[in-house]
Curated annotation (Swiss-Prot):
Domain Lipoyl-binding: 24-106
Keywords, ordered alphabetically: Lipoyl
Subunit-level organization: The glycine cleavage system is composed of four proteins: P, T, L and H.
GO CC aspect terms: cytosol; glycine cleavage complex
Record text on cofactor binding: Binds 1 lipoyl cofactor covalently.
Record gene name: gcvH
Protein name: Glycine cleavage system H protein
Length: 124
C-alpha cells in the first residue's frame, strides 16, 4: 500500500503539494507514482524563475520503465529546483516526500487539490 501523508494535498496526476505557509509550496510525485514508474534514472527539472501555467508539463521524471511528465497544479513561478536529483534521481524513489521533492514554487492560485482521504479513495 502506498504511503499518503496527511500534511499534503494531492493532484489527480499523482503529485503532492505541501503548503509552506508563505504563498510558497513544495512539490513532488507521490509514493504511488514512484512505485509505478520504478527506479528513477533521470529527472529533468525546470529553471528557477520559470513561469508555468496551470496543467502545463514542466518537469520530466524518467525511470527504467518510462518517462512521465509532471504537471502544474496552478499558475506558478519556480523558486527552487532540487539540484540533488541531478546526481541522485533515485531520491525520488527512496524519499519521495522528503529528500526527493522536485520543486518549490510561488503561487496565489493553488486550488482544486485533494486531501489525503480523497487521494486514498482514488487509489482504491
Amino acid at each position: 500500500m502506498s504511503e499518503i501523508r496527511d500534511d499534503r494535498q494531492y493532484t489527480q496526476t499523482h503529485e503532492w503539494i505541501l503548503d509552506n505557509g508563505d504563498d510558497t509550496y513544495t512539490m513532488g510525485i507521490t509514493d504511488h507514482a514512484q512505485a509505478l514508474l520504478g527506479d528513477m534514472v533521470f529527472v529533468e527539472l525546470p529553471n528557477v524563475d520559470d513561469e508555468v501555467s496551470i496543467d502545463d508539463e514542466f518537469c520530466v521524471v524518467e525511470s527504467v520503465k518510462a518517462a512521465s511528465g509532471v504537471y502544474s497544479p496552478a499558475d506558478l513561478q519556480i523558486i527552487e529546483a532540487n539540484e540533488a536529483l541531478d546526481d541522485e534521481p533515485e531520491l525520488v524513489n527512496s524519499s519521495c516526500y522528503d529528500d526527493g521533492w522536485l520543486v518549490k514554487f510561488k503561487s496565489h492560485s493553488v486550488v482544486d487539490l485533494m486531501d489525503s482521504t480523497a487521494y486514498a479513495q482514488i487509489l482504491n
